[in-house]
Amino acid sequence: MGLLSQYMCERAQGTRHAIVIDPADQSPDVAANRALAAANAGSRMILVGGSSDTDMTNVHATIVSIKEALELVTWASTQDSDSDENPSQIPVVLFPQGAAALSPDADGITFMMLMNSKDPRFLIGEQVRGAPFVKKSGIEPVPMGYLICEPGGKAGEVGKADLIGYDDHER
């Protein structure tokens, strides 16, 4: 079990909150400020990604900006540049829309299968495309099954989800 998986399991007994920051919605600096605000409010994980068409450059810049901001806050609180303390105690994890939106600086990646997609690309295709990058970069994959319910929103549309209805109790 990797460090990120251990972190997630250690926190299984308490309340947890993760925030999703979509790099397409703001600049990397604004994303870093939002991540800091979320961390100050109690978020214990920052997920970077979403259903938008975001390229690797934007995702990478957002991850780097968030991690630098978290490191600066940690350093400022210790005022010890020689501290052995982990600079980013809140993991920054990729929540990618596909293999074209990755960064080697992430602490991990949700390696997800959109379980109710009608498109094989979202069932296994993007995972196959992204696997060599994940292995080469050494970022920790976190297996994840993902279901989209009605109304589905942009993620349901992009992922070609066979939406689970409000009253659909048999699936």
Predicted feature residues:
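Hydrophobic faces of well-ordered beta-strands that scaffold small-molecule active sites
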Residues: 16-21, 46-48, 92-94, 109-111, ...
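N-terminal amphipathic alpha-helix/helix-capping segment at the start of soluble metabolic enzymes
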Residues: 1-21, 127-143
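Short, acidic/polar
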Residues: 26-37, 97, 166-170
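Glycine-rich, proline-tolerant flexible connector loops at the mouths of alpha/beta enzymes
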Residues: 45-63
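Conserved anion-binding
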Residues: 97-171
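Generic structural signal for hydrophobic
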Residues: 37-38, 66, 101, 171
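Alpha-helix-loop-beta-strand connector modules within alpha/beta enzyme cores
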Residues: 57-98, 130-142
